[in-house]
Amino acid sequence: MMNASAMDRQAVYEDYERTRRTFHQLLDSASTADLARPTRGTKWTNGQLLWHMLFGYIVVRALLVLVRVFGRLPRGVGKAFARLLNAGTVPFDWVNYAGPLGAVKVFGPRRMAVAFDRVLDSLQRRLAAESDADLARGMHYPVRWDPFFKDFMTLADIYRYPTQHFDFHHRQLTLDSDDGRGGKPEVS
């Protein structure tokens, strides 16, 4: 288990604020055509990928509950649960892909920005209230579901996860390209 007292909460807060500024800047500067443009390395549009990036923070609230439950159970129970979830990777992948397709029809840029702020504020309040013992509690995760899931993750790891997810997908956006193929303009 990780040494929870080693978690730099301020660094997590700063990362959350950085992603908040970035998310708002991306939404504020994107035209309707920009949001409809394909992304780099995904089947989503920029708008759909932005929603998926927001969802990475939203899902953390559910993951926090899972850690609180499975972190108190024998490790074997958590391992079995992770194996069961890994077995369900195909339906998870389908839902994970299809969710943003419909979500952007309901959550336009303005609603995404509001939702992003709310979820970050909620996560920051929760993190402030966590004890070191809570942050050290952990569980096994389905490693096939996400490249940032490790076999065993603590609550502290879960608070860091959405920013890793955000930064990874941020590189796949084509909002700053001229050609829609991911080519970045030359900077002199």
Where would I find each of the regions flagged by the language model?
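Charge-dense, helix-prone N-terminal extensions
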Residues: 1-2, 125, 129
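Short, Lys/Arg-rich amphipathic segments at extreme N-termini
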Residues: 13, 19-35, 170
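Short, contiguous alpha-helical
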Residues: 36-90, 121, 129, 133-188
